[in-house]
Amino acid sequence: MATRCSHGDVPVASLSRLSRFGLAPFPLGFFSAGLVASYMSEFISHAARAEIEIQALEVQVDNLYGMEGSLLRGTMTGSALPVEATFRVKTTGTDAQNVQLAHLAVASSPADTLLRNAVDSVFTLNHNGTELPVTRVAASSRKQQLDPTAVFQAAQPGQTADFADNILQRLEGVDTLGGERLGTVRSAAVGLSDEQKRQVHVRGVGTLRTDGMKELQVACFQPIGSVFRFLSDDSAAVGGVERAPSGLVYLSAGLSFCFMTQLGRYAHVAKHAMHSYQIVQDTSFSPPAALNEKGETPTCAAVDTDVFIGNAEDPEKTQTLLNMGEQTCYLHAACRSGIKTRIRLG
């Protein structure tokens, strides 16, 4: 299974501006929503295989990230800590069976392979229409994709009749998530300073609706952020109706948004004369449990990203921009770190 995310022609730092003011979901929120949805899909598949009826299902994921160092000195580095997944379930199975289903859900989750496999992401770099060799980051072995500008110019809203309305929505007046009040620290900025030492706590909580859709609520728990609702459905290939994006789509979108945010942040702080940046990002996963009848260990390929930079800087500074974007990205850090998910039943 593969997902492709293409983004581009975004003014520097504008990706973070909407989320800064709570008007749109923040990049890490997409990733957490995708992780929750993936765990839920796997739990549902394993329960069906065991002929266990699900009467209620809620999955909570807590992600912790860190950022420390100086952008201008090249020491700033993003980091990701182990994920905590809490399953709150009511089924026709025993407590022991519910515990087993939770562990199977995480073990077979294609999304979780991205965390536990410790794989360096790979890149190509295009500078003002000319492909440059990458330096500190790992190089992609594939041919660089074409400039995605034409794709954006031709893009039109989909006309799928069954697609749900309001798949992304800010929830007004909500200040609790997972039964706890959001944290006590408010962030006054998005970190556009040279020196950083911060930790970010993101929480996502998903519930299974009676119509089979997954309703996900996600917030930056610390520092405090707005609560957003995501709707998710599985692809038709695994029994879904495709009424909303799948977990892997949200996960992949979060990765690309986070990376682009870091590119924009570095360009802003380093005062790069960058007028455009675009990416084409491919993520590939082995099939989920619904299609994995042999119970083979799930795998994923390295996140593969083509980066297109338009600027008035020299090639060396453009290569540094890519290096620092990858180095400070919370989610590329998660991919290369080999994170184990901690599981519990609530």
Residues covered by each model-derived region:
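Extended beta-strand/beta-hairpin segments
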Residues: M1-A33, I44-A253, G264-G346
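Alpha-helical metal-binding/catalytic segments enriched in His/Glu/Asp
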Residues: L35-Y39, C258-F259
